[in-house]
Curated annotation (Swiss-Prot):
Motif window: 'KMSKS' region: 632-636
Entry-linked InterPro entries: aa-tRNA-synth_I_CS, aa-tRNA-synth_Ia, Leu-tRNA-lgase_arc, Leu-tRNA-synth_Ia_arc/euk, M/V/L/I-tRNA-synth_anticd-bd, Rossmann-like_a/b/a_fold, tRNAsynth_Ia_anticodon-bd, Val/Leu/Ile-tRNA-synth_edit
Keywords: Aminoacyl-tRNA synthetase, ATP-binding, Cytoplasm, Ligase, Nucleotide-binding, Protein biosynthesis
Chain location of the short sequence motif 'HIGH' region per the record: 41-51
Subcellular location: Cytoplasm
Lineage: Archaea, Methanobacteriati, Methanobacteriota, Stenosarchaea group, Methanomicrobia
EC number: 6.1.1.4
Cross-referenced PROSITE patterns: AA_TRNA_LIGASE_I
BP terms from Gene Ontology: leucyl-tRNA aminoacylation
EC category name: ligase
Organism: Methanosarcina barkeri (strain Fusaro / DSM 804)
Signal peptide: none
Full protein name: Leucine--tRNA ligase
Name of the gene: leuS
């Protein structure tokens, strides 16, 4: 082995060996298979730390399964469809300054190459090469024969087949539907197309039509039931409103809304015509009619009304909305004569419409007063609003004032009221984003009611029922995400599946439309199996007919009929079908949590729609995001840490280990320079340890006579083997690295500190295999230096051997380590130079007391009095009658509080503490730097300060002779 760890040299060496040996190219055989996939990357930038985390998790799982004896397929492709790459090409062609800066400075594209990437095709080719290179350089065990891009002509044939079959099942429909829309591109946008607001959802509001003469002042609300409690409207005096003629289904009305709302209305299925501007003052102080109750309500000024939200006019329900109550109260003593308002607003009566167990008649007023909220600007007002809303939604029922709706649950009334209000022309539906959305082209997006649009009919209850069934049979990692998946399935509505611009596959039954980017990335895992035959030239595009896909993916028809249609031999068709049946279904789909509400859901929907139940996915795993020094990363805006730059600077194995050890699976990780530097030092130490063990030439097997410290390290390793395997099964990579590296490293240090050396080679043999999924290049290098001919990537992963567990040895070493730490702490605190240390082992009666306490704890009968009574009934313990009550009063609270772990281990093997400490005297004297004497607390020969009485089982009392340091 080299003197120093040189990651880049080692990594290039082993990547070359892996490629040459083709050990990651998977073919069907007699072994149990494991098919793992992760979302292929979108090629509008270089791979970043977020990809690094998700992809490395996948690789670690793949490598672990491979070492456990599974036949593992871990493939990769590239996603390029949609509009982002087209938009990026336009920005580069136009030399957009921000784009040129971000892609040269942060993505690392050379300045002479970047300007040439001015077409989508050039961008795809460039990032495809760079992404594959980055994944090879970090050491992913991918079968690269199966790679493809989503604009490959053969892939388009696969997508056409999928959509023809979905259409035949009635799962693709045409109609009007609200979609996220870019007015500039004149296209629907999906998450990949969005610059800001990627997590925004389309929210359905009910517009309530308050009337003033021949005008309608509509108000958007998420809670149409509160219309029964409206006392006034809020109008912003600083906003310009417009009068518009609005026509829907032949019904013509004149509406007053903000200019921003007018723009949004033009994208709905209404016909909207601008008439004139309306000064805000002209609609403040007017008396309007509540269309639901026919009550008269007044409009009042409110600067908090935002013109871009809803219609720019807000209805006020002060009995149930804390902000409305506060805003109304704030106006009680304000002179509003400039708006023609002279009446006393205190006379406005609150209207109660919801009965809530936790509140009286006016929940908003009650919570404002109980929380001491003084104004609308008080931060507690937001908290109060959430509390009232939550309690009313989950436990509220409507009162008599709501007429026929009395007694209905608030949680179930929205759709009923919206339907009834629409039918009576007192309300309409209006769609709004949950937060602002900006397209990657820079244009603010709108909710557009698109006519003649194609949709995937995800709201279909029969389709959803199959997805629920699939989910119920699946393993979800972590399990707590199951509820989120269930909720997302429940809420999922029809989704636009086509666009008119961008890269992608044309809808086979309507060539004017292109299938959108999330719609063509749902069952591509099955294409990996076909891609291997395309790559070797056995399949051509003309062979990929509908009957080809029907036969090899669905098993429909027979090979003879498919052969006649495709021009392929029956034998080849049967071979491809055999490959599909071997590899499918997907055993694990692992992804970032941002894909839960979209891609991962669609992945399930399309699988259950097209495949038989035995081909449905088996498991889903979800991981968190990665930030950079506390900042959220962005491919288009920065900051960003690319996979290539991390590996180039720190090496593949250090990058892999660090990204997986910073946070547990669903937690968000934060990449920090200080952290990666620490990981580098840890890996250096591991390399140095391995080099030292190998060069020592000492090899011992388990038949050698073993000392206690040897039995201890054997036992500890088994614990780490068990816990690492368990953590990897649960995809808890941080926990796995803690056990397989950091905790084991600490124990190896203790083993060597205690003079252990017999089993260092055995330790290294297991340690290298434990770490191989995480740091594969380094482990291959060490494995080879140990004399192994076959790669560690294919070696047997360590398996737990219960026969090597030695509780006695572990307990003994824990006592020695704890005793040493206690002595060192006393010396540190007292600032003493020790001359002699006296250790006092616990009297036997204390051990008996603790054993009795453990038994009574298990029987749920542990109480101070009960334990004293039981101990005093023992004739051998009666003579300790004065000391027993004090000790019992000390230990029982520890048992009760759950802090009795150190006592409970006493129920295990018997330890002769005095003999153990006497055997360890030479070690303790070397560590402490002075002589050590061991006494029994039952009869200490020397105890000038009566320390022996403090001795407890496994925790000797300590007295130090010495002098203060000058």
């Amino acid at each position: 082995m080299e003197q120093d760890y040189k990651p880049h040299e080692i990594e290039k060496k082993w990547q070359k060996k892996w490629d040459e040996s083709q050990i990651f190219q998977a073919e069907p055989d007699k072994r149990e298979k494991f098919f793992i996939t992760i979302p292929y990357p979108y090629l509008n930038g270089n791979l970043h730390a977020g990809h690094t985390r998700t992809f490395t998790i996948g690789d670690v799982v793949a490598r672990h399964k491979r070492m456990l004896g599974y036949n593992v397929l871990y493939p990769m492709g590239f996603h390029v469809t949609g509009t982002p790459i087209v938009g990026l090409a336009e920005l580069i062609a136009n030399r957009d300054p921000q784009t040129m800066d971000v892609y040269e400075r942060l993505h690392g594209i050379p300045g002479d190459i970047l300007p040439t990437l001015d077409t989508p095709e050039k961008i795809v080719d460039y990032f495809k090469r760079e992404s594959e290179k980055a994944m090879r350089n970090i050491g992913y065990s991918i079968d690269w024969r199966r790679k493809f891009t989503t604009t490959d002509p053969t892939y388009k044939k696969f997508i056409e087949w999928q959509y023809i079959r979905l259409g035949e099942k009635g799962l693709i429909v045409k109609g009007s539907h609200p979609v996220k829309w870019c007015p500039n591109d004149n296209n629907p946008v999906e998450d990949h197309d969005i610059l800001y607001g990627e997590e925004a959802t389309i929210v359905e509001y009910t517009l309530i039509k308050f009337r003033y003469k021949d005008l309608v002042l509509p108000c958007a609300t998420l809670r149409p039931e509160t219309t029964y409690g409206v006392t006034n409207l809020w109008v912003n005096p600083d906003v310009t409103y417009v009068k518009a003629k609005v026509t829907l289904d032949g019904n013509e009305e004149f509406w007053v809304v903000s200019k921003e709302a007018f723009r949004k209305l033009t994208f709905t299925d209404r016909t909207v015509e601008y008439i004139e501007d309306v000064p805000a003052k002209s609609i403040i102080g007017i008396k309007l009619t509540n269309p639901v109750t026919d009550d008269e309500v007044i409009s009042l000024p409110a600067s908090f009304v935002r013109p871009e939200n809803g219609s720019g006019i807000v209805m006020s329900v002060p009995a149930h909305a804390p902000f409305d109550y506060l805003a109304l109260r704030d106006l009680y003593d304000v002179d509003l004569s400039e708006y023609g308002i002279t009446e006393d607003l205190r006379k406005i009566k609150l209207i109660s419409l919801i009965k809530v167990p936790e509140f009286g008649e006016f929940p908003a007023k009650e919570i404002v007063e109980s929380m001491g909220i003084t104004s609308q600007k008080d931060p507690k007002a937001e908290e109060a609003t959430k509390i009232v809303y939550r309690r009313e939604f989950h436990g509220g029922v409507l009162k008599e004032i709501t007429g026929k709706y009395e007694g209905q649950a608030v949680s179930k009334i929205k759709d009923i009221l919206t339907r009834d209000f629409i039918s009576s022309n007192t309300g309409e539906t209006f769609y709004e984003f949950s937060e602002p959305v900006v397209c990657r082209c820079g244009t603010p997006c709108v909710v557009n009611m698109v006519k003649g649009q194609w949709f995937l009919n995800y709201s279909n209850p029969e389709w959803k029922a199959k997805v629920y069934k699939c989910l119920a049979q699946m393993r979800i990692v972590p399990e707590e995400y199951r509820v989120e998946f269930e909720n997302k399935i429940d809420w999922l509505k029809d989704k636009a599946c086509a666009r008119r611009k961008g890269l992608g596959t044309h809808l086979p039954f309507d060539k004017e439309w292109l299938i959108e980017s999330l719609g063509d990335s749902t069952i591509y895992m099955s294409y990996y199996i076909i891609a291997r035959f395309i790559e070797n030239g056995e399949l051509k595009i003309e062979n990929l007919t509908l009957s080809f896909f029907d036969y090899v993916l669905l098993g429909k028809g027979d090979s003879a009929a498919a052969s006649a249609d495709t021009g392929l031999s029956p034998e080849l068709l049967e071979e491809i079908r055999r490959h599909f049946n071997y590899w499918y279904p997907v055993d694990l789909r692992s992804s970032g949590k941002d894909l839960v509400p979209n891609h991962l859901l669609f992945f399930l929907f399309h699988h259950v729609a097209l495949f038989e139940e035995d081909k449905w996915p088996k498991a889903l795993a979800v991981n968190g995001f990665v930030s950079l020094e506390g900042q959220k990363m962005s491919k288009s805006k920065g900051p960003i840490l690319t996979m290539e730059s991390a590996v180039s600077k720190y090496g593949a194995d250090i990058t892999r280990m660090y990204i997986l050890s910073t946070a547990e699976q669903t937690q968000d990780a934060d990449w920090q320079r200080t952290g990666i530097e620490s990981a580098r030092r840890q890996v250096d130490r591991f390399y140095s340890f391995a080099k030292g063990v190998i060069e020592s030439g000492k090899r011992a097997d388990l038949s050698t006579e073993l000392k206690q410290i040897d039995r201890w390290i054997l036992s500890r390793i088994q614990n780490y083997i068990r816990d690492t395997n368990s953590a990897l099964y649960s995809i808890q990579t941080r926990e796995a690295i803690q056990n397989s590296f950091f905790l084991l490293q600490n124990d190896v240090k203790w083993y060597q500190r205690r003079g252990g050396e017999t089993l260092l080679y055995y330790v290294l043999d297991n340690w290298v295999r434990l770490m191989a999924p995480f740091t594969p290049h380094l482990c291959e290098e060490i494995w080879e230096a140990m004399g192994h001919k076959d790669p560690v990537s294919l070696a047997q992963y360590p398996l737990y051997n219960e026969g090597l567990i030695d509780d006695g040895a572990e307990l003994a070493e824990e006592m020695i380590k704890g005793t040493l730490e206690d002595v060192e702490e006393i010396i540190r605190v007292t600032k003493m130079t020790p001359q002699k240390v006296h250790l006092y082992t616990a009297p036997t009666w204390k051990a008996e007391a603790i054993r009795c306490a453990c038994e009574m704890q298990l029987e749920c009968s542990l109480e101070v009095g009960n334990l004293i009574k039981k101990l005093m009934a023992n004739p051998d313990l009666k003579r300790f009658g004065k000391e027993i009550p004090k000790f019992v009063q000390k230990i029982v609270p520890e048992f009760k509080s759950g802090s009795s772990d150190r006592y409970e281990i006493l129920t295990g093997p018997d330890i002769d503490e005095q003999a153990l400490l006497k055997e360890s005297i030479s070690f303790l004297e070397k560590e402490i730097g002075c002589s050590v004497e061991v006494h029994s607390a039952d009869s200490p020969a020397f105890d000038p300060e009566k320390k022996a009485r403090f001795a407890e089982p496994l925790r000797p009392a300590i007295y130090i002779e010495g002098k203060k340091k000058e």
